[in-house]
Each structure stands twice: as structure tokens, then as C-alpha cells.
A protein has these predicted regions:
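Short glycine-/polar-rich loops that comprise or flank the Walker A/P-loop
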Residues: 29, 85-91, 119-123, 154-158, ...
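Pre-Walker A-like glycine/lysine-rich segment at the N-terminus of P-loop NTPase domains
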Residues: 1-54, 183
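Charged, alpha-helix-enriched surfaces in structured cytosolic catalytic cores
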Residues: 40, 44, 86, 138-145, ...
């Protein structure tokens, strides 16, 4: 079942100053497009997903991915760092998958001590909403299973999380093998191949069973005919 994102929210994350409600983007049914001028937060929006999924963020200055744990100070809102002694930097995503709703949040607490800004380690919070009950997922292995298999599966991430400069690396048209792999991943060809193999196997078994039953019926009919002629 596909993942359907319901909302994405930020809290004091880069230029998204303020709480989650102030920086929440509710998605509608169908394709949702995030459009903005330069330096208005599109790359930071992207970094929110990267932080959740891979604990990395894209540094536009060095034009390279950085470990998020080493970039937390830079990830914090500049306005929050100036105006608040205590604040939280976080990203929250609400999504549905196979009839179950999930809320995933990653955050770090910031504080100023003797004029020096410090922060806690980043933390993950996942809640499953099902049958009118909210169930916190506390086990780290279960959390990673939801992130890597339910939210955005690992195999789809190279195609689901793209920046412009990534397109040339995504599909190598000069390589038949690379192109085949891309098509296989996006279209689920391997799944269809598996279904075809199962269907062929079942067809062979059905044909063999039919021939066996037909042979038995033919033998029985001959026996009945001989009995009638006696």
C-alpha cells in the first residue's frame, strides 16, 4: 500500500521560525507542489525529510550532505537563537499507509547557558493511530522498520527524494543495466515477474491434474463399456 502524506510541519527549523502549527503544510488528495522563490525554504523542506529518513542534511554552502548531529546548530532558526533561551528544533510528518495513520517527529532541544548555545541529542518520536487508539512506538528497531519499510521504503528513496543535480545520476541512459534497474524499481517489474512465474507454475499443475483426471475418466468409461457389452 502506498504512503499518503497528510501534513508536514517544522518548528524553528532553519528559516521556519515558530511552532509546528505556524509552519504546517496540509497536503490535499493528488499531487502537491511546493513552489517558492530562491532562499524561501524549498531546500530546507527537503532537509526535513532527509533528517527524518537518513539523519543527514544538504549543506547548500558546501554543496554536500552533512551528518545532522554535527549540523544541529546550523539547522536551528537564526531568529530563535537570538530571541529565545530555550526552544525546540523539529520536523513532524503525518502520513497514512494501509489504513493506518502515523505521526513521525524528530527534534532536538536547545538551551543557552552562560551565553553559550547548547542542545540535546536528536530524538525520534513515532505514534501509530489505529482503531481510535494512539500507540507510541518506543522500540528503536520498530521505529526504523516503520521509517525504512512503511514511510518511504529504502528502494524508492533514490527516486522519491531528488534535487535537480541528482537527476543525471538517477538514470544513466548509456547503461542498459542501470536503466533496467530504474524501470524495475519504479514499476515493480520484479513483483510482476514473480506473479507471472507463480501463474505459469499453477497453469502447469492445473494442466497435469486435468490430464490425470481425463485419463482416469477415460479408463472408467472404457471399463463401463466393456461391462455393458458382456
Amino acid at each position: 500500500m502506498a504512503t499518503i502524506i497528510r501534513s508536514v510541519a517544522f518548528q524553528n527549523f532553519y528559516n521556519y521560525y515558530g511552532n509546528y502549527e505556524h509552519n504546517r503544510y496540509d497536503f490535499t488528495t493528488g499531487i502537491n507542489i511546493v513552489n517558492a522563490d530562491n532562499n524561501m525554504g524549498k531546500s530546507k523542506f527537503y532537509n526535513g525529510f532527509m533528517w527524518l529518513l537518513d539523519n543527514r542534511v544538504y549543506d547548500s554552502d558546501s554543496k554536500a550532505f552533512k551528518d545532522a548531529d554535527e549540523s544541529l546548530i546550523k539547522m536551528a532558526s537564526g531568529k530563535a537563537k537570538v530571541e529565545e533561551n530555550k526552544f525546540t528544533v523539529g520536523v513532524r510528518v503525518v502520513f497514512d499507509n494501509d489504513g493506518v495513520s502515523y505521526t513521525i517527529e524528530k527534534y532536538a532541544d536547545f538551551f543557552t547557558t552562560n551565553g553559550v548555545l547548547g542542545h540535546s541529542e536528536s530524538k525520534m518520536k513515532i505514534i501509530r493511530h489505529e482503531n481510535n487508539a494512539d500507540t507510541p512506538i518506543l522500540d528503536k528497531d520498530q521505529q526504523m522498520n516503520i521509517i525504512n519499510r512503511v514511510f518511504i521504503p529504502l528502494a524508492l528513496r533514490p527516486y522519491a527524494l531528488l534535487q535537480g543535480e541528482s537527476m543525471d545520476r538517477l538514470v544513466d541512459l548509456s547503461s542498459k543495466q542501470a536503466l533496467s534497474k530504474t524501470i524495475d524499481t519504479l514499476a515493480g517489474i520484479s513483483v510482476l515477474k514473480g506473479i507471472c512465474e507463480i501463474a505459469k507454475s499453477m497453469a502447469k499443475k492445473a494442466e497435469a491434474l486435468y490430464k490425470h483426471i481425463d485419463s482416469v475418466n477415460s479408463s472408467n468409461n472404457k471399463a463401463k463399456l466393456l461391462d455393458t457389452q458382456k
